């Protein structure tokens, strides 16, 4: 059908003789996650890249001898991005209370199917040289709804006659089943401490516009990759120069602190990993107190392919398509 796929044809003049091995690659666009899995099972697809693979199907394909899976080694965190210009979310004490009200281990086990792990910092702990082991949200903000209520009381956010303290508009990408399930779990946890949550699911394009252009949200669920280095993938979520309305995946929380800007800049420019780590360690300590985002989960990115496909997992984040080949 016109418009539902792209066909890539082998370049016979490719610089490396004999490659690529495949005559053509057909990339199909399949919107519904369940339809992608059905197409895989029917043999209509040979490979689903991690971004499009629904995690709720992991056990199904992992236990099927027709398929092979691999976790992509690419540190990625799912954040709850906070609109820090919207009261009472502008108060770090309120954000800390919201973190304490979250059972992130429950979300990891029941939403992300035990894959990945609860995030322990704004820095993915898999970036071992830059992660500060003294910053651990599991220890700093353990799940404790009674304590969260007390923290909100101390912040001056008292419960009304109906038990409600304030209301959050929670925007998420409704095309991702894991985001829907995570949003529903978070709604329950926060409502347990008197915070009413209006869930607002929308398609990705609508969500991105409302978040990054219109700033029309209280909290939103987004996934940020680290791009392999804090200077590339982490700083953009927290430095002042990344507050750019209309530009996606930047500092949409609009958090701004000169000390944090300075530390990220020094961490970027330092000449050794040891020196860079010194600045990044300090910035994590500050962000752990300010919590402009609530880091939810260190994601496991899963690729799946037919066992007929070879060398498909050889390229790290993306396949090296020139060496991929298939059984006939």
Segments and roles (model prediction):
Residues 3-5, 10, 77-78, 101-131, ...:
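Detector for C-terminal structural segments
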Residues 11-60, 187, 196-198:
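Ligand-site clamp/hinge motif
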Residues 26, 83-87, 94-97, 132-141, ...:
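Second-shell loop/turn segments in exported
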Residues 34-45, 64, 92-93, 184-193, ...:
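Short helices/loops that flank or line small-molecule/ion binding pockets
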Residues 118-155, 174-181:
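Structural transition elements
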